[in-house]
Amino acid sequence: MATKIFALLALHALLVSGTTAAIIPQCSLAPNAIIPQFIPPVTALGNEHLAVQAYPGQQVLSASILQQPIAQLQQQSLAHLTVQTITAQQQQQQQQQQQQQQFLSSLSALAVANQAAYLQQQLLTSNPHSLANAAAYQQQQQLQLAMANPTAYVQQQLLLSNPQAATNAATYLQQQQFQQILPALSQLRMANPTAYLQQQQLLPINQLALANTDAYLQQQQLLPVNPLVVANPLVAAFLQQQQLSSFNQISLVNPALSWQQPIIGGAIF
């Protein structure tokens, strides 16, 4: 009887310890069939615990916290790329403006230094065919100039080939004109020495008119004050006739020289 009571108490103790304990010890002698009976109450008790209930919420919160910096970083990177694009466009526009200003300044300097080269540059930039092949376009322009005005073409070739002419084109052209005048003057000296001497006197006046306009105008005012002309009007008429005859001879010998005679005649009359 006592053994039966003791066995019942032991079995009761095992049942009570199984319901209250959360972990079954490994050294338990309970059979494997008894263990599944204790698992559902343990899991039910664990699910009812506050820490276990808060764990999914903590996971959601941590995931949202981790996702917020990623979104902020993405927004910051997009903003940074936008700012970089805007600054790059502004820098490109500034560079284009600087290049245009440099090009305009160089064109203005070219226009002051060499008007012919400036006009050629303007024609090259305004013509699409000239942009494609500038060398062929320049050759075509030179051929057209040679056919239209051979004298101007020869002068242009001389200006391009002579470094002195490039520095001072006006003086070089005057020298070339005087060299063209010399043969006509030699013929005039052989035909009419008096007219030749008058022409030699007129040449310095013409040079003075080209070099210094003020001095030329002063000389214009002093020319009428000639005592020989004032005293004898016949002398003045004779001199005028000699000058006109010399002009006619020069126009027959050298038409280019006759084009300059209005300047010389203005200095006399």
UniProtKB/Swiss-Prot annotation:
The keyword Membrane is assigned to this record: no
Signal peptide interval: 1-21
Single GO molecular function: nutrient reservoir activity
UniProt xrefs under InterPro entries: Seed_Storage_Prolamin, Zein
One Pfam family matching this protein: Zein
Alphabetic keyword roster: Seed storage protein, Signal, Storage protein
Family as reported in the entry's similarity comment: Belongs to the zein family.
Function: Major seed storage prolamin.
Protein name listed in UniProt: Kafirin PGK1
